[in-house]
Design a protein with these regions (language model features):
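Hydrophobic transmembrane helix module of multi-pass membrane transport proteins
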Residues: 97-239, 243
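Alpha-helical transmembrane segments of multi-pass membrane transport and lipid-handling proteins
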Residues: 18, 86-113, 312-363, 395-396
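N-terminal membrane topogenesis motif
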Residues: 1-23, 79, 83, 218-241, ...
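Transmembrane alpha-helical segments of multi-pass transport proteins
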Residues: 182, 237-238, 243, 439-495, ...
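Short runs within selected transmembrane alpha-helices of multi-pass transporters and secretion channels
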Residues: 20, 59-66, 125-144, 152-160, ...
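Signature of the first transmembrane helix
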Residues: 5-63, 100, 104, 129-130, ...
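Helix-loop junctions and terminal segments of transmembrane helices
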Residues: 59-74, 281-305
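Helix-terminus/linker motif at the lipid-water interface of multi-pass membrane proteins
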Residues: 22-40, 111-112, 173-174, 239-284, ...
């Protein structure tokens, strides 16, 4: 593995992801304050119904392009790369146009049965963005394979900037009077943003792929097989999982109503959970998202070259770093969740929900990185099977438990299914990579360090985290102390390993 190139790409992706997350969170906060929790609930339900169409259009194609391009470069056959990408373009366009037709024709029925109100227009507004999303997914896989992450970052930044700018302009000029109008203008911004991103990606792709074009360009003979082996199963599995996820999201407000909440209160609770708390919970994952995506081509190359020791080493380090980061993040949300909710949304209830869901962070982040590692090791079908099982179980439990227990039942379902999914995925990864899980080093010691740093800070007479300065100080100081602790623990563990290594024992004898 080219460590320097990997590190540079990781830094570029992390910084771009961080900027994008800040823009997205700022937009979310502004949008939620305009339409309120109930409006956010309606907005999230529309997106939930739209996600299966996105899965049909994009699932698996990015991974297929990455695998085909890295394989061509590994076999010293770069002249087949343009043909491979073109075939993936064709497949993704076919799937996305099919999804467009189905969603456009079914928008009225879906709105009437599941969404309520005048949601069909907002749902149809998202349809033209599907082909753009499909093509962008192909080019994202290409950029990942050639380590051109800055090109992917530029395209994503252009998308977010266009989406936010157009949505804000539409709100300012047209002043939506209803939640349906607000959702419609937001979906218009999202569709235009996808078009801008696709155009930007295509321009950068054309400029870069020219180096692989020559008079001896040959068709990629393995493209059709790769589409059948990777893209098609992934598309079908992701589509099934997205349908289950949509069903899960539709069942949440329905179950809360059956438990005694009014329709308005149930939609508001759902909007606060999915539209306000969950984005905060996933916000720090931008530091891991770039890392997880870069692992796919690196692990694919190691697998193709038979570098088993490299696979084991990278897997162990990835899991350790993920848990170090996620344990600290979870502890921070538990300690300061209420204040963070007040700072971002001016609502203590959102902060309290953030505290209750904070222990999920290690499970969510570990699942993200484990999924990337499994895909790189050609275990994507296993990963999809586990995710589909998880989604099916959630839907069944939502239908049975939520009407009886309300939000408490929802939390129980999230934790139990999260533990099951991570256990299955992690067990498969450990077996494939040939390593064992180090509970003391990866979980217990980080938990102890995070507890000491964050607990100590919370007892000091410092500005409240509900103020911007207080949050910055808390993150900087507790994070710095935690890094020092982690560095010290690493040095001690390395010294112990050195003392008890085979070379040291032989020398002593």
């Amino acid at each position: 593995m080219k460590k320097k190139a990997f590190f540079i790409n990781a830094v570029i992706l992390t910084l771009s992801s961080l900027v994008g997350r800040f823009l997205y969170m700022g937009f979310r906060v502004w949008f939620s304050q305009l339409i309120g929790p109930e409006g956010m609930g309606a907005y999230q339900l529309i997106l939930s119904v739209f996600l299966p169409a996105v899965a049909i259009s994009t699932a698996g194609v990015s991974l297929t392009v990455t695998r085909l391009v890295t394989s061509a470069m590994g076999k010293k056959q770069p002249e087949t790369i343009p043909s491979a990408v073109a075939r993936c373009f064709g497949f993704s366009l076919l799937m996305s146009l099919t999804a467009c037709v189905v969603l456009w024709l079914g928008a009225d029925s879906l709105s009437e049965k599941f969404l309520g109100g005048n949601s069909a227009q907002a749902l149809r507004m998202l349809v033209p963005g599907l082909p753009f999303m499909a093509l962008s997914a192909c080019m994202r896989g290409y950029f990942l394979a050639v380590r051109g992450v800055i090109r992917s970052a530029v395209s994503e930044f252009a998308e977010q900037l266009a989406t936010i700018s157009l949505t804000v302009a539409a709100f300012w000029l047209l002043s939506p009077k209803t939640v349906a109008d607000a959702c419609l203008y937001s979906m218009l911004g999202a569709t235009v943003g996808e078009g801008v991103s696709c155009g930007c990606s295509f321009l950068l792709y054309r400029l870069h792929v020219r180096r692989y074009r020559s008079a001896q360009n040959r068709p990629c003979t393995g493209a059709g097989k790769a589409i059948l082996h990777i893209t098609l199963p992934s598309t079908l599995s992701h589509a099934a999982r997205s349908v289950l996820s949509a069903a899960e999201n539709l069942l949440i407000p329905l179950g809360l109503r059956k438990c005694g909440a009014t329709a308005s209160a149930a939609l508001a609770q759902y909007g606060m959970l999915q539209g306000m708390v969950m984005p905060l919970l996933f916000f720090p994952s931008c530091f891991l998202g770039a890392f997880a995506s870069l692992l796919i081509p690196e692990m694919s190359e190691s697998l193709a070259a038979g570098k088993n020791r490299s696979i084991a080493s990278v897997t162990g380090r990835s899991l350790r770093l993920t848990l170090l980061f996620s344990v600290f993040t979870a502890c921070f949300f538990v300690a300061f969740g209420r204040e963070i909710g007040v700072l971002f949304y001016r609502q203590e209830e959102a902060g309290e929900l953030l505290r209750l869901l904070a222990p999920l962070v290690p499970l969510l982040y570990l699942d993200m990185v484990t999924d990337g590692l499994l895909k790189g090791l050609d275990q994507q079908l296993r990963s999809l099977a586990y995710n589909t099982l998880d989604a099916s179980l959630r839907v069944a439990l939502m239908a049975g438990i939520l009407p009886l227990m309300g939000l408490k039942g929802y939390f129980c379902i999230l934790y139990s299914c999260g533990i099951l999914n991570v256990t299955l995925s992690l067990s498969r990864l450990l077996k494939t990579a040939g390593i064992r899980f180090r509970v003391m080093e990866w979980v217990v010691l980080p938990l102890l360090g995070a507890g000491v740093c964050i607990g100590g800070w919370s007892m000091l007479p410092v500005p409240s985290v509900s103020q911007p300065l207080g949050l910055i100080l808390a993150v900087t100081c507790t994070g710095g102390g935690y890094l020092l602790y982690v560095s010290g623990i690493k040095a001690v563990l390395q010294k112990r390993k050195g003392l008890f290594s085979r070379h040291s024992l032989t020398k002593a004898i």
